[in-house]
Amino acid sequence: MAVPARVPRRLAIVPFRGGSVVSEGLLTWTMLRGPAWIRLLPDVYVHRDGYRADDHRMWCEAVTLRLPTDTVLAGRSAAWLFGADVLARDAPVTVVLPPAARLRPHPRLRVVRSPLPEQDRTLVGGLPVTTPLRTAFDLGRHGTRVEALVAVDALLRRRVVKLPALRAYAADRPGWPGAPLLREVLAMAEPLSESPMETRLRLLLLDAGLGPLTAQHEVRTGGRFVARVDLAWPALRLAVEYDGDHHRERAHFRRDVARLNALRAAGWVVLRFTADDVLRRPDAAVALVRQALAERRAIETNH
């Protein structure tokens, strides 16, 4: 939608401080109270054409305008800005405040109080955030075990942080809250995990005692590449894959058929699971994999 001429161009799509633009003479308080402007936070506005209720970037920009000195975006908000798929729809913006800082509460804001040394702060896309290392460190020691692992895997996948560096960073901070959870997460973290649901499926199988398994295993026959599978027991030629909704698309479906036929010709058995299997029928999924493992081991033994 075209921006009306009376709307200053630099205020058309990004949040801004109301007091600042009024003092500059760009708008008046009466105009800001009109239907063209949305009040996001105290003294923070955005034009209605730039407003999206679930636009996390917009909310991060708005919150940044209200942040006290030495306070930055953190947690899942920082991870999302680094490109990690860890954010739920309508999630609040997470910020980390030094112990002495103050910030007015708001439903779209989640405040974490923690020491925040200079070396743990950086910029991404012009916004102040915790560094990738600090972001992974924080997410890996809070929340549920599965969500902590999902977040760490996602950041590792984006290659904004390396697992050895994260382990060293954590080892230097053994007394921080959540350290036992973080140690467990780092022991299971997998940089090759390609999606949050793949991480959940892998953890489900590991917790059931079905490991060890290999992530993103390349299947080859006679030196020729056949396919790469999500999770595998290479010696047994058994693979487990997570299928997201994109596998329903016609072109993707056709590629899947050809790929599965090639794996079958190479002597592999492939089990495929969806989000419903992992989240709603985990026991059935585990039982199916356990049975397949037993059958493949029996075949290998007989050979």
Enumerate the language-model features and the residues they cover.
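Surface segments flanking catalytic/ligand-binding clefts of nucleic-acid enzymes
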Residues: 9, 15-20, 24-26, 69, ...
